[in-house]
């Protein structure tokens, strides 16, 4: 029966050739409209965490983007993450399903409504409770609920910043890393780090980086990289031995007034992740979600050691 269920899932849903999950306005049902790639059923258990930066980077008035507002790009990235999580689960043997997807905001929101939305985005499947309907609700939930979250944050207009540094110091091991899983952390951020309660400086290392800091450090002119290396600039290491964590950074949005800005952000993040022993990471600029679909798919659905051993 279990084999039959899994077989039906693959036959029915890999034939879909559309692009999103949408609700049917005439009923409680929804129509599933995106394609599932055909993957090996022998796949690692996935534990995917997403850390959202709800600072003023998402403010469409302060940072307008005619092609697509940055908060809508985030929503598109979240939808793509959910779609690939669905594809991963759909392709696994039912008896081996044990996979998780969750979203975090740091600092934790005081708004109970927002906490309820975050809780709704905490999804897990195992062989005892997985159903076709629950799997296929994932991208719809992520699309609709994340849109409401971003719109509420913009309407509230109280951007306290995102404490990315402290999350990686105090919470990432407890919240995002579990034994027996392939642990992935996706960070949606413009690449700058700042929170009013986490401002520390150790020699030329900091727990923050803003466009003003880049300019103040002299990283807006030729020779910036030599200075960066000689003085040992960078982020203060927030943790050590995160070798069981893979990190995908999406949404880098450098200040266009400095031609070196993107390179500076990339060097800061790369050095930081390497020093924390993150072995697999990618850092991607803010692009349209349609252009990022393959990047996200390749990172989440890549062939793993478990598959190679089968």
Residue ranges: model-predicted function:
Residues 1-39:
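Bacterial Sec-dependent N-terminal signal peptides
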Residues 21-23, 212-310:
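Von Willebrand factor type A / integrin I
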Residues 43-122, 126-180, 184-186, 193:
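Von Willebrand factor
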Residues 58-62, 111-114, 194-198, 257-260, ...:
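Extracytoplasmic/secreted cell-surface and envelope-processing proteins
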Residues 103-107, 126-141, 195, 202-212:
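Scaffold/interface architecture of coatomer-like assemblies
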Residues 108-130, 295-307:
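Charged, often glycine-rich, active-site loop that binds/positions anionic groups
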Residues 162-246:
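Flexible, glycine-rich surface segments
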